[in-house]
Amino acid sequence: MLGDLDVDYCIFTYKTFSDIQYIYENVTEEFDGILTSGSFPAHMIHLYYKEEKRPICFFNTDEAALYRLFLKLLNENRNLDFTRVYADIVEIFGVGLKDFVEGRSPMPDIRELSADEFDMERMLGIEQEEYGKHVRLWEEGKIDLSVTRFSSIVPALQEAGVKVYFPFPSKRYVGEMCDKLLNEIERRKLEEQI
């Protein structure tokens, strides 16, 4: 995917959203754009650095990734009860997982996060808040497995004994987001020449 493109890129990793502030300091002017692994990290950049003008694109866990994961889980366990699965990616936005899986509710659109609803304080606490929900539901015996969109909490959930899954986006989808970023970079460079 990225190997097929004639671009230079650098990958920065974070453990929690609070790390993004410090990682961003390494994203110097030589970088023409930023691609993040989700709308939440992109939102954190906007909250920390309101003056950032470079294009920021992101890839989320898309609907196809969730359906692929749930199909895999159903193939492993035909009796899977979705009322006993906690999926923060839909629950955070008030969508019931069973309704989503059965096609009665769409996946929440998290491409644009409101700075009012998702302010800095909430964003800095959301990972631990969700970690706590997963662990509490697991320890209370209310769920048989968890699905999280926060890759940063997966190791801690596994350490706590929670049966947790992370729905990875497809290579094609990530490639599309890379193309979107490259197109946005090119568009902005052309605008500067006019």
Task: Please annotate each region the language model reported.
Residues M1-I194:
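Alpha-helical/coil-rich non-catalytic "connector" segments in signaling and regulatory proteins
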